[in-house]
Swiss-Prot record:
Role description: Accelerates the degradation of transcripts by removing pyrophosphate from the 5'-end of triphosphorylated RNA, leading to a more labile monophosphorylated state that can stimulate subsequent ribonuclease cleavage.
Gene that this polypeptide is encoded by: rppH
Domain of life: Bacteria
Keyword Transmembrane helix recorded: no
Protein name (database record): RNA pyrophosphohydrolase
Signal peptide from the UniProt entry: none
Region (Disordered): 170-197
InterPro entries on file: Nudix_hydrolase (IPR020476), NUDIX_hydrolase-like_dom_sf (IPR015797), NUDIX_hydrolase_CS (IPR020084), NUDIX_hydrolase_dom (IPR000086), RppH (IPR022927)
Cofactor(s) named in the record: a divalent metal cation
EC number assigned by the record: 3.6.1.-
Length: 197
């Protein structure tokens, strides 16, 4: 489903724990990391698409998370020219995304990236709140920065967030030169990737 401007409607998912860390996922068979995300199907609301993608990509169900916040506006990024499919009609030039901030309320052992036959990810880890903004692929960086800034304004403002989940000192920006933290790795089950993202 592509809109009139050539953007594909999409949802982005940020899952946090009580330490103020966020789930960072490794793309299947690649050394590339990102937040879970996926397209919105015809007839779906953004929230319905989010819960579907949450199960397909991370193996979590609605009962396993608490929805803390959803971005107010659509956030857009354009695909690099090398990723454009000029023979597709209509042509998709990028994604427009609604972002959701979720709190994990179950044990992390429930995270299972092999719920489907063609998983998007083969590993994950917890990282500091701002770490993904610096580490994501460059063409998604501005959208990540805007989404995380909006989430931070909610999480760390006691007048907007009555849960008082995190403290500022738990979300300092990660330095780019630091060693990558340990991640949960899944053994490959097949060689097929899922839909183009």
């Amino acid at each position: 489903m592509i809109d009139f401007d050539g953007y594909r409607p999409n949802v982005g998912i940020v899952i946090c724990n009580r330490k103020g860390q966020v789930l960072w996922a490794k793309r299947y068979g690649q050394n590339s990391w990102q937040f879970p995300q996926g397209g919105i199907n015809e007839g779906e609301t953004p929230e319905q698409a989010m819960f579907r993608e949450l199960f397909e990509e991370v193996g979590l169900q609605k009962k396993d998370v608490r929805v803390l916040y959803a971005s107010k506006l659509w956030l857009r990024y354009k695909l690099p020219k090398r990723l454009l499919r000029h023979d597709s009609k209509p042509m998709c030039i990028g994604q427009k995304q609604r972002w959701f901030l979720l709190q994990l309320v179950c044990h992390e052992k429930e995270i299972d990236m092999h719920r489907t036959k063609s998983p998007e990810f083969d590993g994950w880890r917890w990282v500091s709140f701002w770490y993904p903004v610096r580490q994501v692929i460059s063409f998604k960086r501005d959208v990540y920065r805007r989404a995380m800034k909006e989430f931070a304004q909610f999480l760390f403002d006691p007048t907007k967030n009555d849960t008082a989940l995190f403290q500022h000192h738990e979300t300092k920006k990660a330095e780019t030169g630091k060693k990558q933290p340990y991640y949960h790795k899944y053994a490959p089950q097949n060689k097929k990737g899922r839909k183009r993202r």
